[in-house]
A protein has these predicted regions:
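Bacterial N-terminal signal peptides
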Residues: 1-2
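Mature, structured domains of secreted/extracytosolic soluble proteins
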Residues: 5-168
Length: 168
């Protein structure tokens, strides 16, 4: 089911999101860059729609099993890679300011549905940092907001959002 969902949602990408990721060398995004290039399907999921992409920095991937990237890049695990990327993509273009406003409007926490179907809980911690909570109850911080122009926006996060049944 996950593979069918991913294939139905993702289409060939234009290069704009990958160009933003590559252009921001100081953010250390080489790992997510490799994964996005391997699928070539990170944006333009449905023509005319806008998306928010949560891009893990390299430090985020270092916290995972050392073989995770190799696993995700192998052709036989393409559906796992698509699933992982869909956990990092939210339909709708939400700036940091809009996310904060939604948290405030909802009384301290809110939810954003990812393309995988998971409702990602979002709140502000005591330091006023935006925190995302994945299915494994791991807390992931937004560390660099608001990259990109046009229909899609990228926020850099310090963790990898993992599916509950994840083997990573």
């Amino acid at each position: 089911c996950t593979e069918i969902f991913a294939q139905a949602r993702f289409r060939k990408s234009s290069d704009s999101t990958i160009k933003v990721i590559k252009a921001e060398e100081r953010l250390k995004l080489e790992n997510i860059e490799k994964l996005v290039e391997a699928t070539r399907n990170f944006e333009n999921l449905e023509p005319g729609k806008k998306f928010t992409i949560l891009a893990p920095n390299n430090k985020a991937f270092k916290r995972l099993n050392s073989k995770t990237i190799d696993y995700l890049l192998s052709p036989e695990h393409q559906s796992d890679l698509n699933d992982m990327l869909s956990h990092h993509t939210i339909e709708g273009r939400y700036t940091e300011k809009q996310i904060r406003a939604q948290i405030e409007k909802e009384g301290g926490k809110t939810y954003f549905k990812t393309l995988s179907g998971f409702s990602l809980m979002v709140y502000l911690d005591k330091d006023n940092t935006i925190i995302f909570v994945d299915q494994n109850n791991r807390k992931i911080r937004m560390v660099e907001p608001n990259y990109g122009k046009g229909d899609n926006i990228i926020h850099i996060i310090d963790g990898v959002i993992l599916p509950y049944s994840s083997i990573y």
